[in-house]
Amino acid sequence: MKLNLQKPLVIFDLETTGLDLVKDRIIQISYIKVYPDGKETRGNEIINPEKPISADITALTGFSNEDVKDKPTFKNIASKLNEEFKGCDFAGFNSNHFDIPLLAEEFLRAGI
């Protein structure tokens, strides 16, 4: 199916330390960026959330504190993601109620 896009579309999903938009942090962001000409690029970042990952979240996401200890923080990759996402529309499961607001919070904390 060909999409009729006016600007790039980022379809993305987050794994996080919980469901609190203010207190919780991103552990992983995976995305596909679809351009109006049909070209696609993909990205996947595992992120050190700078807070402990609970056993419940490890069971849910598969990510442990050990997995993220040497990964970059969101602040370390925020500029790169900002450039990648600039001018794009966004889509994803439950993205308007959770993923987009949490991503916006992370960008604000990073000073972007």
What kind of feature is each model-predicted range?
Residues 1-112:
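Conserved non-catalytic scaffold segment of RNase H-like nuclease domains
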